[in-house]
Amino acid sequence: MATSSTLPAVVPALGGDQSLNHYLADIRKFPILKPEEEYMLAKRFQEHQDPKAASRLVTSHLRLVAKIAMGYRGYGLPVSELISEGNIGLMQGVKKFDPERGFRLATYAIWWIKASIQEYILRSWSLVKMGTTAAQKKLFFNLRRLKSNMNAFEDGDLKPDEVDSIATNLGVSNEEVVNMNRRMAMGGDSSLNITMREDGEGQMQDWLVDQEPLQDQQIEEEEESLVRHKLLIEAMDKLNDREKHILTERRLSDNPKTLEELSQVYGVSRERVRQIEVRAFDKLQKAIMELAGDRKLLPAMA
């Protein structure tokens, strides 16, 4: 984890969980920027590398980092460390931000913040030592949510139908789901000493979350949703008509069709429809990532 010396001097010190409540109180003192203020500061930093402009951009978004970091508290790491890593991602986002592209800084920086936090969690869990694949990362950061959606809170093995559902949802193999679930149930590296569940009660972090609206949060979420929707529409054009139709009917419809129904439409087996669905989903994800990368919406990976 980076030390506080890598952060701008105006960022409050964050030494450990004991000071976390003080830190969250301190960052609420920084004013929220209006769109025109944010634009002018971003232009000043972009054109003149003005450190004061950069500091104001960073400090006005520290609450965003804290809120995102709170969402990762179920991985057994101190929230203070997650926030510190997120702050580093925020500063990278500020450095790369182009105000002329029409997005608010929060919409752009959220990619960098999440990437920085996730990479830190992965390093801490030593998944990289296993040769972390894109599928493993996807599973690691979505498995708890999907299990929660199907009320599968137990730490034991998943039921076969639960494995099938998660594998199909994420476009990975059943074996990868089973292996990742077992690894996460064991708590990763024993040195992490994980003591909290995602549905646990009485944790200090639970009452430290800022309940006030987060700097035009609704507007920012709408902007991000619009960006993702545009990327999805463009990425769908990379699929052929059959792939597009099957993927839409299986994953993007309010009333998804069954494999049997689609197998009758195309005169192929249910397994063939499933294969086309998985392949189309994989192509769609890659297309979205390529489009996002071309538009500089993603951090550059080392």
Swiss-Prot record:
Member of which family? Belongs to the sigma-70 factor family. RpoH subfamily.
Q: Which UniProt keywords apply?
A: Cytoplasm, DNA-binding, Sigma factor, Stress response, Transcription, Transcription regulation
Name its species: Zymomonas mobilis subsp. mobilis (strain ATCC 31821 / ZM4 / CP4)
Q: What does this protein do?
A: Sigma factors are initiation factors that promote the attachment of RNA polymerase to specific initiation sites and are then released. This sigma factor is involved in regulation of expression of heat shock genes.
- According to the UniProt entry, where does the motif Interaction with polymerase core subunit RpoC sit in this chain? 81-84
Q: What does the subunit section of this Swiss-Prot or TrEMBL entry state?
A: Interacts with the RNA polymerase core enzyme.
Coiled coil located at which positions?
none
| HAMAP family linked to this entry | Sigma70_RpoH (MF_00961)
What name does the UniProt record give this protein? RNA polymerase sigma factor RpoH
What CDD domains does UniProt report for this protein, alphabetically?
Sigma70_r4
